[in-house]
Regions:
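N-terminal Rossmann-like dinucleotide-binding module
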Residues: 1-49
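Core-facing hydrophobic residues within beta-strands of well-ordered domains
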Residues: 29-31, 66, 146, 194
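Conserved SAM-binding strand-loop segment of SAM-dependent methyltransferases
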Residues: 51-59
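Beta-strand-loop-alpha-helix segment that lines the small-molecule cofactor/substrate pocket
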Residues: 67-68, 74-75, 79-126, 141
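Hydrophobic residues in well-ordered beta-strands that form the structural core
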Residues: 93-94, 119-121, 150, 242, ...
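Predominantly a Rossmann-like dinucleotide-binding segment in NAD(P)-dependent oxidoreductases
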Residues: 125-220
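Contiguous beta-strand/loop segments that form the cofactor/metal-binding neighborhood of enzyme cores
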Residues: 185-276
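C-terminal helical cap and adjacent loop that interface with cofactors, partners, or active-site loops
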Residues: 256, 266, 273, 283-297
């Protein structure tokens, strides 16, 4: 094996720990630097990571010891950091969404193409046993020709558990850009590309109340829609209805269901790598769980 691929991490919020722990055990990857707009975060994180330097964001983006920038900033900064990395000849992999707006996403992709560097974006959970087992079942004809599908993500809002949830309710946030990528990536993986979209959205509350951490009880403004419903028309002709909401308390709906001519497939939470894939065939009397047949755990 050659030299380890060198990664610099920008953004040291809640999600960064999962990435740092995973990369620490990967023999082909080495984290060489961390940075955050809040310098105290990088100064506190770096000492716990052997061989990792705490840098400013600009220092990390231009560092000769970084091959790929792992962009874990809040959504509103995704495009800015990605463009900075690309401008210094770095590959960039970021948390979802790729950018806060479609125009910014196009700008990032165009800049990367000109620079000859790679751009990647979460989610990678689509490679797990949940979605991959479902895809294998569809390919095997377990439900016949897919006719329509549904996707549902309902939560009262991340402010209940996240100590600094402001970004969920500003540009680049909201349920569709925050959680929707897991569902949309899986739907495209299972049913193919989408050629047309219809949607509607609403904003039911002007404020949210933080429910944990040092800011408990603080009210934050809601600047984006918190409920989004849509219909996706896949190229193959399948129709998918999708609901993503920060306004519902709970749901009994499967995260994703695909209905075919001879059966229905229930797909587990696409925000996870695993989970049971269940099949109800025409003439069956109950659901049955399919054994994992593909993907990574």
């Amino acid at each position: 094996m050659g030299d380890a691929h060198r990664v610099g991490v920008v953004g040291l919020g809640v999600i960064s720990r999962a990435y740092l722990d995973t990369l620490a055990g990967h023999p082909a990857v080495r984290v060489t630097a961390v940075a955050d707009l809040d310098a105290s975060r990088s100064a506190s994180v770096a000492p716990g990571l052997p061989g990792v330097r705490a840098l400013t964001v600009e220092e990390l983006l231009s560092s000769p010891n970084v091959d790929t920038v792992l962009n874990l900033t809040t959504p509103g900064a995704h495009a800015e950091i990605a463009l900075g990395a690309v401008g210094h000849g770095k590959n960039v992999y970021g948390e979802k969404p790729l950018a806060a707006t479609l125009a910014e996403a196009h700008t990032v992709m165009a800049a990367a193409a000109r620079a000859g560097v790679g751009v990647g974006c979460a989610p990678d959970t689509v490679l797990g046993t949940g979605v991959q087992t479902a895809r294998a079942a569809l390919a095997a004809g377990s439900i016949g020709r897919p006719l329509f599908a549904s996707a549902v993500m309902v939560t009262p809002g991340h402010e209940r558990w996240h100590p600094h949830p402001d970004f969920y309710y500003t540009e680049g946030g909201g349920p569709l850009l925050d959680m929707g990528p897991y569902y949309l990536t899986s739907l495209v993986h299972l049913l193919g590309p989408v050629r047309a979209v219809t949607g509607a959205s609403s904003r039911l509350r002007a404020e949210r109340v933080i429910g944990s951490g040092p800011r408990t009880g603080e009210r934050i403004p809601v600047e984006v829609d918190s409920h989004v419903s849509g219909v996706l028309e896949h190229v193959a002709g399948t129709l998918t209805t999708i609901t993503t909401s920060f306004d519902g308390v709970a749901t009994t709906a499967s995260p994703i269901e695909v209905h075919g001519e001879v059966g229905t497939l229930a797909v587990p939470d696409p925000n996870r790598f695993d989970g049971d894939v269940r099949l109800f065939g025409l003439g069956d009397t109950q659901w049955r769980t399919l054994p994992p047949s593909a993907g990574y755990v």
